[in-house]
UniProtKB/Swiss-Prot annotation:
This is 2,3-bisphosphoglycerate-independent phosphoglycerate mutase. It comes from Shewanella oneidensis (strain ATCC 700550 / JCM 31522 / CIP 106686 / LMG 19005 / NCIMB 14063 / MR-1). Substrate binds at H125, R155, D156, R187, R193, R263, A264, D265, R266, K336. The gene is gpmI. It is an enzyme of class 5 (isomerase). It comes from the Bacteria. The active site is at S64 (phosphoserine intermediate).
């Protein structure tokens, strides 16, 4: 006999923050009658998704990976950015066994040390201070051929802001006496996560063969040429940088290749192209045998030395639900599927017992401002069907629109994205009401509420440190102030009448009135 469930749904509106300033605030200017009604009718508040509250440095904007780890684990999780920066400050980084072994092996055979990653102060996928520490460490250990393959940001940073980073690293290599920037390319190509292998192949060919659309003798010159082609940092075409003799750097057998991104989701595809013998995403002209090291763990099936393996998180929400015989569903589009599964489960790839997953393909468009509704209608169709099936105790759903369209910097499109999500929420709430379910609406971090940089006047494409909404569509209740993302999992267990495990240090925010 099938037991009928009265589900609790957690709707994560990605990139949807609250900002007092209404100028170029897509969340404010969007027509959102559903959320307006829910805020008027139900208990609601604001919670924190950034800085120390999510295990990041004070003031650091939140991001989707960090947000979902905190949401799912029910505790503040010390993030890789903080962890690695601390290791550098404590001089532990320069003794890291995985990094030292790769550098030493290359030095011993006269090989090169190639360092690749997002050259950015953004702190979301990487930090340029970590890349600098790696360059310094390689030279200190005797490497004379150090090649930096710089992926440019413009998404978690202003759209045209890479010049200062490139200039700094040119100066750094001059000071060190060895090394140089060997290539630049936008993250749009090197860090795709949606199986657009034609993009990744351009980064692969650039790093392995020095094969590129453009060639320059200086990285800043290459960047300025890209700007003259109207390419912002994120979209800079593959550009090889030649040495004094006009030669490009290539990846050879025995070289070290160290990937300095600490966030997994946009690091996986290009990593697999380098290390997977059965890789078939695109035809590889060369497959050099290199000592490949990842800064953190990108996926269980990526077999490479890891400089900083993940902490093992036990008793996350998913695991607690499994252990108590509860059923759960995770559902999102491609762009945020890893977040409601891998990251929400504390870095575990395999589903828990009783955990179903539904993946909706994100639309195949160059940038999501071209289709701001993304696949939200199809996602909601599946979500409503799952609610009405009464199979699940807990449903975790992410709507990517606010974040993915917010990143384009297109204000009008971001407004449309918010309006599309609002309409979907209306359908979800209606379906939950039919089966006696309840729902929490929140976000992982801000983005769409600030679409222009008030200082520079450029489009603001990055996340924010704003508070995010927290709405309880259910029984009459009060909501505590001062909450944070790590309070959400304990809140869900509390609403279910379940005890909260000791590992969850977050506190229930919702108190139902008797």
């Amino acid at each position: 006999m099938t037991t009928t469930k009265r589900p609790i749904a957690l709707l994560i509106l990605d990139g949807w923050g609250y900002r007092e300033n209404t100028h170029m605030n897509a969340v404010y200017h969007a027509n959102t009658p559903v959320l307006d009604r829910l805020n008027a009718q139900y208990a609601h508040g604001l919670i924190s998704g950034s800085g120390l509250d999510v295990g990041l440095p004070d003031g650091q904007m939140g991001n989707s990976e960090v947000g979902h780890i905190n949401l799912g684990s029910g505790r503040i999780v010390y993030q890789e950015l903080t962890r690695i920066s601390k290791a550098i400050a404590d001089h532990e980084f320069e003794q890291n066994p995985a990094l030292c072994d790769a550098v030493d092996a290359a030095v011993k055979t006269g090989g090169a040390v190639h360092i690749m990653g997002l050259l950015s102060p953004g702190g979301v996928h990487s930090h340029e201070e970590h890349i600098e520490a790696m360059c310094r460490m390689a030279v200190a250990r005797g490497a004379t051929k150090v090649y930096l393959h710089a992926f440019l940001d413009g998404r978690d940073t202003p759209p045209r802001s890479a010049k200062s980073s490139l200039s700094h690293f040119d100066d750094l290599f001059t000071t060190l006496g060895h090394g140089r920037i060997a290539s630049i390319i936008g993250r749009y190509f090197a860090m795709d996560r949606d199986n657009r292998w034609d993009r990744v192949s351009q980064a692969y060919d650039l790093i392995t063969q020095g094969k590129s659309k453009f060639q320059y003798d200086n990285a800043v010159t290459a960047l300025e040429a890209a700007y003259s082609r109207d390419e912002n940092d994120e979209f800079v075409s593959s550009s090889a940088i030649t040495d004094a003799n006009g030669q490009v750097a290539t990846l050879q057998d025995g070289d070290a290749l160290i990937f300095m991104n600490f966030r997994a989701d946009r690091a996986r595809q290009i990593t697999r192209s380098f290390i997977n013998p059965e890789f078939d995403g695109f035809a590889r002209a060369v497959t050099p045998k290199v000592n490949f090291v990842t800064l953190t763990e990108y996926a269980a099936d990526i077999k490479a030395p890891i400089a900083y393996p993940s902490d093992n998180l036990v008793n996350t929400l998913g695991e607690v639900l499994q252990n108590r015989g509860r059923t759960q569903l995770r559902i999102s589009e491609t762009e945020k599927y890893a977040h409601v599964t891998f990251f929400f489960n504390g870095g575990k790839e395999e589903p828990f017992n009783g955990e179903d997953r539904i993946l909706i393909n994100s639309p195949k468009v160059a940038t999501y401002d071209l289709q701001p509704e993304m696949s939200s209608t199809e996602l909601t169709d599946k979500l409503v069907a799952a609610i009405e099936s009464t199979k699940y105790d807990v449903i975790i759903c992410n709507y990517p629109n606010g974040d993915m369209v917010g990143h384009t910097g297109n204000f009008d499109a971001a407004v449309k994205a918010c309006e599309a999500v609002d309409a979907c929420i209306g359908r979800v709430v209606e379906a939950l009401a039919k089966v006696g379910g309840e729902c929490i609406i929140t976000a992982d971090h801000g983005n769409a509420e600030q679409m222009t940089d008030e200082t520079t006047g450029q489009a603001h494409t990055a996340h924010t440190s704003e508070l995010v909404p927290f709405v309880f569509v259910g029984r009459d209740a009060t909501i505590d102030k001062g909450g944070k993302l790590s309070d959400v999992a304990p809140t869900i267990l509390h609403l279910m009448g379940e005890s909260i495990p000791a590992e969850m240090t977050g506190k229930p925010l919702i108190h139902v009135k008797e």
